[in-house]
Curated annotation (Swiss-Prot):
One of its GO terms (molecular function) is GDP binding. Component of the SHOC2-MRAS-PP1c (SMP) holophosphatase complex consisting of SHOC2, GTP-bound M-Ras/MRAS and the catalytic subunit of protein phosphatase 1 (either PPP1CA, PPP1CB or PPP1CC). Interacts (active GTP-bound form) with both SHOC2 and PP1c (all isoforms) to form a tertiary complex; SHOC2 and PP1c preferably bind M-Ras/MRAS, but they also bind K-Ras/KRAS, N-Ras/NRAS and H-Ras/HRAS. Interacts with RGL3. Interacts (active GTP-bound form preferentially) with RGS14. It is linked to Noonan syndrome 11: A form of Noonan syndrome, a disease characterized by short stature, facial dysmorphic features such as hypertelorism, a downward eyeslant and low-set posteriorly rotated ears, and a high incidence of congenital heart defects and hypertrophic cardiomyopathy. Other features can include a short neck with webbing or redundancy of skin, deafness, motor delay, variable intellectual deficits, multiple skeletal defects, cryptorchidism, and bleeding diathesis. Its cofactor is Mg(2+). Binds 1 magnesium ion per subunit. This is Ras-related protein M-Ras.
Length: 208
């Protein structure tokens, strides 16, 4: 693995938001990405954010990832986070038909909050390791992604993980393509939660 020094300053920061129904594995994906461990059970009422220095395509960046709660009662809070997000991973479980059907709702909400006709997003079909429980096919997932003109990726947070790093990195690549100025200058830091107590921020450095 190649090694290089992490630039000390002027790194672009990408605020990535992980959204989707409760129980689809948002926290498992996020924790696998940052800590390289699989956590099967996680408190769904907790919103948490993580920081990570990462080199993607020979460009260093800081990823500030927010793992949102999936419950409906958190929808107003989630909308607040969406206003500051640079890109979104819309996650559903291939074992949960309802979570797949709700992809439309999340996509529409993001565009409404952003007041845009398009915005950097990736559709993430999670829990593909549970083949015996799968209800949503790859073809259905791809059709949904094509409908919304966003990339599609299948993931599993269970060890050995599948496409977890790639999902987050691909979203950064989409942001760089659609919002090129993001890769050129350091973004002013903003809080995810306003005055609300924040979750644990973990700062890591990786080279990929």
């Amino acid at each position: 693995m190649a090694t290089s020094a992490v630039p000390s300053d002027n790194l672009p920061t990408y605020k990535l938001v992980v959204v989707g129904d409760g129980g689809v594995g948002k926290s498992a994906l996020t924790i696998q990405f940052f800590q390289k461990i699989f956590v099967p059970d996680y408190d769904p009422t907790i919103e948490d954010s993580y920081l990570k220095h990462t080199e993607i395509d020979n460009q260093w960046a800081i990823l500030d990832v927010l793992d949102t709660a999936g419950q409906e009662e958190f929808s107003a809070m989630r909308e607040q986070y969406m206003r500051t997000g640079d890109g979104f991973l819309i996650v559903y479980s291939v074992t949960d038909k309802a979570s797949f059907e709700h992809v439309d709702r999340f996509h529409q909400l993001i565009l409404r909050v952003k007041d845009r006709e398009s915005f950097p997003m990736i559709l993430v079909a999670n829990k593909v390791d549970l083949m015996h429980l799968r209800k949503i096919t790859r073809e259905q997932g791809k059709e949904m992604a094509t409908k919304h003109n966003i990339p599609y990726i299948e993931t599993s947070a269970k060890d050995p993980p599948l496409n977890v790093d790639k999902a987050f990195h691909d979203l950064v690549r989409v942001i760089r393509q659609q919002i090129p100025e993001k890769s050129q200058k350091k973004k002013k830091k903003t809080k995810w939660r306003g005055d609300r107590a924040t979750g644990t921020h973990k700062l890591q450095c990786v080279i990929l």
